[in-house]
């Protein structure tokens, strides 16, 4: 069905299965296990003003019954809700309605509340060649400053290096001081011909690459940023300290941090824990346990120190970085780290 998710329901006789996924409804005969499309036509009339009024009432009741502080942070919820309700008749779209919800809920002065409108508007997607270019370059084409690791040009056959000029994309020349990204519109995952020039040797050549989408690009740039942070800490500490970044307060990030501090950084004297720009999750207890180890035993095998105990927690000094862009549990985790006196907290 090529759908991101699907729902299923069985008929009362248990002979057929109805599957709804994407924009299609299908029926499966369980005896033959074959899917057959179900064609239908339906119309629905929506009273959007009434729908928004219902949602307003729902928000009012949810906050009244479930807000964590029974005093509602000192806000008279009935009076405040009545003041905002009067704007409802004058709202005719969900964008403005989301703004109304955000302003209204903002009166409670608490995080994790608000309204958001996300319209589904199919748009063009600009691909990337996975390179960083020199914005000060004034000639034809684009001058490459750096090819991003694991990007489209990062392979053994490519001759691209710093200083290489991108002259053409799919045969189209790039005029001076022109944003070449317009030539990459809708080119993600599609073979693309790139004409290149080495101004030092005078060589011109072509390479076929497969541009990447923004999601992959952002992930590669993130890894580049973390790698640079680790290199800086390694340089500034003369190899005495390690560096890890907690991308999100979830299982994947925890496993990555755990692997690094007890793996390649196991013999370092200390660790820098970077939580900046983390969007949250729930990891504060795991981080507290991981970085609160206190050495109580050293295992010696044949006269050589083999490991310290506990061997599955960090027993050495650490320091944690935070910033104003941290959200949710990425704010709570640094608080726990500081409150438990696990180490110094640096940042706002």
Residue spans for each PLM region:
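Conserved beta-propeller blade repeats
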Residues: 2-18, 153
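Beta-strand C-termini and the immediately following turn/loop, strongest in propeller blades
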Residues: 18-23, 197-198
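Structural motif
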Residues: 22-31
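Terminal targeting/pro-maturation regions of precursor/exported proteins
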Residues: 30-108, 112-114, 138, 142
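Cleft-lining beta-strand/loop regions that shape enzyme active-site pockets
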Residues: 64-66, 167, 172-348
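Short coil/turn segments at secondary-structure boundaries
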Residues: 70-78, 98-101, 113-123, 159, ...
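Extended, small/polar residue-biased N-terminal targeting/export presequences
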Residues: 88-140, 202-228
